[in-house]
Amino acid sequence: EFRSFTSMYKMCYGCTALTHVRQLETDNVTDMMWVFYGCSSLQKIDGLITSGIKSASEMFHGCTSLHTISHSLDFSNVESQIDTTFTTCRILQNVRFSGTINVDIYMNGCPKLTVDSLLSLLNALADGVTDKTCKIGSTNLAKLTEEQKAIATDKGWTLE
């Protein structure tokens, strides 16, 4: 239980034996920078409350075995780019987003995302933004119809 924590900075950094994370009570956590960085054996995360976090940099960087995050990620309060959060999550398929994403987000290192995961991401993007980019990469772009891509571009996002 992490209810009294406000920071989980590097909490599981480099825990290469970690394979599964079950429900984490992280209601008061605002800093999840590098929390699972380098957890190369981590395959699944069930339940991770992210609604209060302000920093998610490098959060899942190097989680090369991660394929499913079953609880919706809420990045509504994140203040910095979500550009390195999912770096090298090459087999991540299933992830859901809730809340509103107001900062640049890069998922281009996750080419195996399902269409449902991609649509969840696009639907969570804030409306009426300028100079914001959502990078999902050419492999993921090819999975989407023009109408689906317009979910992001009609809100003012650059989709790459």
Residue ranges and their predicted role:
Residues 1-160:
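Negatively charged
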